[in-house]
């Protein structure tokens, strides 16, 4: 039961941080792609790799911070929604491919770099 509580509290914290950062980035940066989600996901991916690399043996901390906080911070559902917007109602190939590549490839590389540090 304590595991669920750690994940729930961490997830709430991460979601609030994501909402706040999204508002900050949207008010300060104009971009043809959803830059707020990109930044949040890339930073989150890096931090997931970094924390996983140093905290594998600390189950409660990993559940709270990786699964909870960073899971709440990063967002696959918003990413999916934003990618669908590039193909509907009219296909925007440059935004679609650049955003997809940045999110998935650079996201993986960010996580790997974080883990390798």
Swiss-Prot record:
The chain crosses the membrane at residues 1-21, 35-55, 60-80, 97-117. GO terms for cellular component: plasma membrane. It holds the Pfam family CRCB. Na(+) is not transported, but it plays an essential structural role and its presence is essential for fluoride channel function. Keywords: Cell membrane, Ion channel, Ion transport, Membrane, Metal-binding, Sodium, Transmembrane, Transmembrane helix, Transport. One of its GO terms (biological process) is cellular detoxification of fluoride. It comes from the Bacteria. It is found in: Cell membrane. The keyword rRNA-binding does not apply. Na(+) binds at residues 71, 74. One of its GO terms (molecular function) is fluoride channel activity. It is a multi-pass membrane protein. It catalyses: fluoride(in) = fluoride(out). Its main location: membrane. Fluoride-specific ion channel. Important for reducing fluoride concentration in the cell, thus reducing its toxicity. Belongs to the fluoride channel Fluc/FEX (TC 1.A.43) family. This is Fluoride-specific ion channel FluC 1. It comes from Staphylococcus haemolyticus (strain JCSC1435). The lineage of its organism: Bacteria, Bacillati, Bacillota, Bacilli, Bacillales.
């Amino acid at each position: 039961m304590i595991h669920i509580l750690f994940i729930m509290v961490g997830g709430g914290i991460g979601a609030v941080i994501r909402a706040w950062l999204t508002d900050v980035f949207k008010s300060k940066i104009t971009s043809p792609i959803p830059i707020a989600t990109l930044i949040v996901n890339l930073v989150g991916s890096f931090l997931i790799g970094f924390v996983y690399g140093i905290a594998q043996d600390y189950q409660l901390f990993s559940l709270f911070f990786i699964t909870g906080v960073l899971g709440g911070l990063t967002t696959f559902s918003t990413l999916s929604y934003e990618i669908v917007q590039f193909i509907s109602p009219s296909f925007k190939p440059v935004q679609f491919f650049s955003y997809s590549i940045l999110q998935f490839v650079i996201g993986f590389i960010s996580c790997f770099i974080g883990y390798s540090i």
